[in-house]
Amino acid sequence: MKYSEFRRWLKAQGVEFQTGKGSHFKVSLNGKSTVFPDHGAKEMGEGLRKSIVKQLGLKD
């Protein structure tokens, strides 16, 4: 999955994005937050994707 596709999926789940440094965003949902690196069209590692989903308390 590409970073841009995952970003769209997160937005569809109701995740709020706040600006961070460079290409990174602070994302939050229901009091849980983490950092999302957005590198556009590059492929995202599966471990990073699963980690962000887990940290936000979302289901795959």
From Swiss-Prot:
Keyword Hydrolase on entry: yes
Pfam name, any one: HicA_toxin
Alphabetical list of Gene3D superfamilies matching this protein: Hypothetical protein
Key words of the record: Endonuclease, Hydrolase, Nuclease, RNA-binding, Stress response, Toxin-antitoxin system
Mitochondrion recorded as keyword: no
Disulfides per UniProt: none
Molecular function terms from GO: endonuclease activity; mRNA binding
EC number: 3.1.-.-
UniProt superkingdom: Bacteria
Function (record text): Toxic component of a type II toxin-antitoxin (TA) system. A probable translation-independent mRNA interferase.
Family according to the record: Belongs to the HicA mRNA interferase family.
Known partners and oligomeric status: Probably forms a complex with the antitoxin HicB 1 which inhibits the mRNA interferase activity.
Protein name per Swiss-Prot or TrEMBL: Probable mRNA interferase HicA
Source organism (scientific name): Pseudomonas fluorescens (strain Pf0-1)
Species classification: Bacteria, Pseudomonadati, Pseudomonadota, Gammaproteobacteria, Pseudomonadales
Gene name tied to this protein: hicA
